[in-house]
Amino acid sequence: MLRSSRSRLVTRNILLRQFKNGNNVRLMNATRFQHNGIVGNEKLASDSQKFVDESYHWMQYRKQMNDPVSRQRLEQLESQWVKSIQLKQDDKGKDIDQPESENRKKEEEQVPTEEKDNDTAKESETSQQRDSVAETQGPASTSGGASGNGESSGNGSGDDGNNGSGNGKPSKNAKQPFPEVYPQVMALPISRRPLFPGFYKAVVISDERVMKAIKDMSDRQQPYIGAFLLKDSTVDTDVIHKADEVYNVGVFAQVTSAFPSKDEKTGAETMTALLYPHRRIKLDELIPPTSEQNLKDESDVSKSEGVENNEQEVVKASLQKMENMKDVEEDDDENLTGFLKDYDVSLVNVSNLADKEFNPNSPVINALTSEILKVFKEISQLNTMFREQIATFSASIQSATTNIFEEPARLADFAAAVSAGEEEELQEILESLDIEQRLEKALTVLKKELMNAELQNKISKDVETKIQKRQREYYLMEQLKGIKRELGIDDGRDKLIESFKDRVSKLQLPETVQKVFDDEITKLATLETSQSEFGVIRNYLDWITSLPWGIISKEQYSIPKAKKILDEDHYGMKDVKDRILEFIAVGKLLGKVDGKIICFVGPPGVGKTSIGKSIARSLNRQFFRFSVGGMTDVAEIKGHRRTYIGALPGRVIQALKKCQTQNPLILIDEIDKIGHGGIHGDPAAALLELLDPEQNNSFLDNYMDIPIDLSKVLFVCTANSLETIPRPLLDRMEVIELTGYVAEEKVKIAENYLSPSAKKSAGLDNANVNITENAIVSLMKHYCRESGVRSLKKHIEKIYRKAALNVVKQLSIDDKPMENEEVKDQKDIKVKQSENKSSAEASTVESTTEENELIKTQKSHDNKGSLEVPETVSVTVDENNLKDYVGPPIFTTDRLYESTPPGVVMGLAWTSMGGCAMYVESVLEQPLTHSTQPTLERTGQLGDVMKESSRLAYSFSKMYLAKKFPENRFFEVAKIHLHCPEGATPKDGPSAGVTMASSFLSLALNKGLDPTVAMTGELTLTGKVLRIGGLREKAVAAKRSGAKTIIFPKDNLSDWAELPENVKEGLEPLAADWYEDVFQRLFGDVDTNKGNTVWSEDFKKIDEKRNKETK
C-alpha cells in the first residue's frame, strides 16, 4: 500500500510538471519512466494524452482545478493510470521477491532519475539548435520519420524520425524534437510578407527587450516564438500591443540562430534571427507587454491557487511548489514562458491549426498540382534564382517521399514562400486550411509571378539588345577612326559631331526634337564635308543645339522692387505703373505670367520701349527687341526654308538663341506699321500664330521645322495708333494706353532724367554746367511742343554739347592730335632697332624691350582719364541765353490766334503724336448780295469723316440759326469757305462737329469767340453732343496751347474725373449734353434783337435790289 501511494506521488508530480510546461510530446513519458519499469504501455500513453488534452495551457488548467466536474474527471484519469501501472508491474512479477525497503528505495529514486533524463535531453536539443542551419540548405522538411535512426540495442522508440534510443539512453548527437503543443509563446510581429511552415526566413529585431528575451529563451532550450503578419506594413515594431494589429493566423517558429548586427542607417544595435516555421497557429489571446497587465495576471494566479483546496495532498504540494519559484531550483524548467514577463514582451495563447483532410486522388487537386508544377517549370526557365530554389525543394521532397503529388500542401506553401505577391494574397494562402483552396490561391500568385518574370525577361532582352547594338556601333566607329588616323584622313567631322552631342547632353530636348536631332546627326555622319548638304545640316544642327531647350530663368515677383525700378526709369505715368504692378501681382499669385500679350499705345517719346525694359528688369527676364515697322516679308517672322542659300530662322528664334532662356521678354516695336499682304506673304497674319496663347506652345518656324514652345515668352508690343492694327491681332493683345506729358511732368523728367544723362554723355558730369528750370520751361514752350520728350531730349543734348565746346575754349587745351604722337613714338622705336643690329642677341632683347614700351604707351593713351574741369569754369543756361544754344524760337506765342476773328474757333484733335490744338476757320468768300448763292467750300486735307461732319454742322447751323434768330437770313446768301490750317497734314476723326458748328454760328452772328476756349465733340443733326475719345491728350494739348476752358461731351465726365490733377489744373471744364450748353457759353451775351439785326443793313440792300429787279 505504501508502494502504491508513493508511485502515485511520483506520477502526479511528473504529470503536473508536464501540464505547467505544456510539453506534450508523444510517448516521451514512456522513455522517461524506463528506469522505474514503466515501459511500452500503450494504454498508459493513451490515458496520459487524454489527461493532457483536458487543457490547452497551464492557466486554463488552474482554473479547471476549481471546477468540481473537472476535478472529478482528473481524479478518475489519475486513478485509471495508477491502476494500469500497478497491474503491469504485477503481470511482469517485478518487485515480488524484493524486500519492501528496496522497492521503497527505487520509488524514491524515480524523480531524480527522471530529472536527470530531462537534463540529458536539453543538452542534446541545444546541440541540435546550434547545427540546424548548417545541416539544412533550402526549404526544410517538416515530415517526421516513422522510426528512430540512432543505433541502439534493446527496445527503442521512434520519435518523429529524429531520435533513437537504446536501453533508454538517447543518442548524444540526436536531434531534439519540437513540441507538438505549445499553448503560450512570445509573439513576434512580421512585416511585408508572412512566414510559411518549412521555409526559413531571417528577421531583424531592433527592440532591446525582444533581443534579451530571445537570448534567454535560447539559453533555456526553448527558442520558440509565434510569428504573425502586421496588417500595416509601414509600422516598425517588435512588440504587439493590440490583437487587431496583426492577422490572427501565424506560424509556430523556432529560432535556429541569432547573432548581433547593426542598422546601416542609424547605427543602432540590432539582432538578426533565423526563423524556421513548423506549423500554423491561431492567436487565441494576447497578453500585452504592460506592467499593469503582468501585475493583474499574477494577482489572478495567486487567487486561483489560494482557493485550491482539493482532497489530494500531493496535488496541493505540487501547486505550492510551482508558485514558490524562488525556493526551488527547477522553477525555470517548470514554467517555460513565465520568465518572459520580466522582459515586457508580448505573449500570446495559441492553438494549432491542422489542414483539412483531402483525397490525394482528387482530380482537382492533381490538376492544380500539375498546373503549379508547369508554372514552376516556365518560371525556372526565365529566372535563375527560381531554378535554384525549385531544385532545392525538389531534393527535399525526394528525400521524404517519391511523389510530389502526395504533399500538395507543402507545394502550395512553397509557391507562396517564393512568390513576390501582395501581403493580403499571401496571408490568405497561410489561412487556407482547405488544400484545394490553398492550391488555387497559390496558383493565382504564381501566375502573377510568371507574368512579372516574362516582363522582366522581355525588358532585359530589350536592354541587352540595345547595349549590344551600341557596343557594336561604338566598336565599328573606333575602328573607322583608327583607319582614318592611319591613313592621315581627318576632316574634323567626328569632332563636330562630338561637339553637337556634347551640347545636346546639357539640354532637355523634347522627344520629337531629340528624334530629329538623332536623324540629322546620323545623316551628317554619312556625308562628306565637301558636299553642299553637309553645310546645310551642320548649320541646322548648330541652330538646334544653340536654342535654350529646358533653360528657364528664375523669375521674381517682388512688388516693391518692381515699383522701385519703374520709378527709377519713369516719372509720373501712375495709371500705367499701377497696371503693370497688377500684372506682376497676378503673376506672383499664379507663379507664372505666360499667356499674356501686352500692347502699349501712345505717342512717340512717352516711354513705351523703356517701359518694356523696366518690366523685364522687374521680372528678372532677358530682354530682346525687334521692330516690325515696314516689314513686308513673312520670312522675317516665320523664317526661310532650309533649301534656300543663306536661310535663317525667324526673329523670334533668333531672340531665343541670343537670350539663352525659354522665358525672355520680347518687345515687338511699331506693330501698327507692319506691312500687309504682298508677294512675300502677310507678316501681320504670321503674328497671329506667334501671339496667340493657344497656338504658340507649338510654334513652327519654317527653318527649324520642329515645334517650339513659346508659351513662356512674354510678348510686349508698342504702337502709336490702334487704327492700323488688324482687328484679329488686336483682339489677342491687352491694350495699355500711354498719354502725353503735361508741362509740369516734362520739367521733372528733364531735370531728373534727361539733363543728368545728357550731361554725363557730354563729359560734363563733374563740371559746373547747369540748365535752369526757366530755361527748360522756355524750351518746351518755344521749341518742343510735342506730347513726348524725345524732341526735348535732343535739344537738351544739343545745349550740353555747345556748353562742352565753350568749356574747352575757356581752358585753352592743346589740341595736338594723339595719333601723331603715337606715330612719332613708333618711328623712334624703329630707329633705335636699326641702330642696334650689330648683335643678334642685343637686337632681340632691345626689340622686345621697345615693343613692350610701345604697348605700355598705347595702354597709357587708352587709359587716359577724363579731363577735370576746374570749378572756376562755370556755364549756366537760362531763358535769356537759351537761343545761343538752340537758335531762335520756333513757336513765338502759345496760341495761333491771340484774338480770334468771327468764324475762327480752337478745336482739339487726337493724332498719333498725341493731342493738338486744331483751329477751324470759316469766312465769307464775298459780300452778301442778292445774286450770290449759298455754298460751302472745304479745304485743309480733310478726311471723309470730317467732310461729313462739316456738312452736318452746316445743316445744323442753318437750322439752329433759323430757330434762334429767325430774322437772321445769313445762310440764305452766304458763300462760306471752311478751312483747317496746316493743309499738308491729313485730318480726320469724328470729334469736330461742335467746333465746326460754332465756327459757322460765329460767322453768322459776326461775333469773335474767346481765344482761351477749346472744344471737342461730335454733333448729331438735332444737336446732341456725342462722346469722343482721347480726352486726356486733348486736355494736355489745350493746356499747352494756353486754353483756360475746355468744352467736351457730358458722357466723358468719367474720363475727366480720372485725369491727374496736374492736367486738370488751370482748366475749367464744361460738359455739354446738347449744343444749347455750348451756345450759352460762347454766345450767351447775344440777345435776340442783336442776333436778328446783325446783318440787317446788308439784307436791306439785298431786298431793295431784288425789288427793283422784280419791277
Curated annotation (Swiss-Prot):
The keyword Cell cycle does not apply. Residues 85-177, 288-311, 819-866 are annotated as: Disordered. Residues 185-450 form the Lon N-terminal domain. Residues 145-167 have a biased composition (Gly residues). Residues 1-21 form a transit peptide. SUPFAM superfamilies: P-loop containing nucleoside triphosphate hydrolases, PUA domain-like, Ribosomal protein S5 domain 2-like. Residues 899-1085 form the Lon proteolytic domain. ATP-dependent serine protease that mediates the selective degradation of misfolded, unassembled or oxidatively damaged polypeptides as well as certain short-lived regulatory proteins in the mitochondrial matrix. May also have a chaperone function in the assembly of inner membrane protein complexes. Participates in the regulation of mitochondrial gene expression and in the maintenance of the integrity of the mitochondrial genome. Binds to mitochondrial DNA in a site-specific manner. This is Lon protease homolog, mitochondrial. It comes from Kluyveromyces lactis (strain ATCC 8585 / CBS 2359 / DSM 70799 / NBRC 1267 / NRRL Y-1140 / WM37). The gene is PIM1.
